Amino acid sequence: MTSISNISKGSIIRFRNEPHIIESLVHRTPGNLRAFYQAGMKNLKTGRNVEYRFSANESVDLIVTERKQYQYLYRDAEDFVMMDTSTFDQINVAAEIIGLPARFLKEGDLVDIVFADDGSILEAELPTFVELEVTETNPATKDDRATSGSKPAILETGAEVNVPMFIQTESIIRVDTRTGEYMERVKK
């Protein structure tokens, strides 16, 4: 157990018997009342956001974590098979842990996996931006290129994103894995 004053953004704590990551932590002392910490947390099992007010002298259970880099190999039913880049050991990571960004994973991508002190997987962090090839999209007509609209495109991983009209099949684009949005065209 450690004091809430020793916790910072990004720390992982056990709150109500489940792992939560601290996304924001603000110390407040309102008028003549006692000081407290307002914490914005994300439950790592359910993905729900939680707001909680800790008293200034309250203690929390800090989870000791270990971060390792793994390489994505393939998908096996509901799990993603990853390989440790240093020991070549393979593990299965549940699709719920990776979440929506999993649709942008392609073989060979590197993923940071965070383990709890008991060996369980807390979260998997994909690169913020990935470069993927557009495999299918409607061809743009001359009139379409003059407007600033967008059109759907299917990427090499099967994910669908909206892209500008000038993007064509076989173009390489950069996608933000957090939002699933097109960022820019990559010139190679």
Curated annotation (Swiss-Prot):
Q: Which GO terms describe its biological process?
A: peptide biosynthetic process
List where this protein forms a coiled coil. Answer: none
Q: Which CDD domains match?
A: S1_EF-P_repeat_1, S1_EF-P_repeat_2
Q: Which InterPro entries would you find in this protein's record?
A: Elong-fact-P_C, NA-bd_OB-fold, Rib_uL2_dom2, Transl_elong_fac_P/YeiP, Transl_elong_KOW-like, Transl_elong_P/YeiP_cen, Transl_elongation_fac_P, Translation_prot_SH3-like_sf
Q: What is its main location?
A: cytoplasm
* Signal peptide (UniProt feature, chain positions): none
UniProt keyword list: Cytoplasm, Elongation factor, Protein biosynthesis
UniProt GO molecular function: translation elongation factor activity
Q: What's in the GO CC field?
A: cytoplasm
Pfam assignment, any one: EFP_N
* SUPFAM superfamilies on file: Nucleic acid-binding proteins, Translation proteins SH3-like domain
Family, according to the entry, reads as follows:
Belongs to the elongation factor P family.
Which PANTHER family does the protein's record reference? ELONGATION FACTOR P (PTHR30053), ELONGATION FACTOR P (EF-P) FAMILY PROTEIN (PTHR30053:SF12)
Question: Entry's NCBIfam families?
Answer: efp, PRK00529.1
Question: What's the name of the protein?
Answer: Elongation factor P
**Gene coding for it:** efp
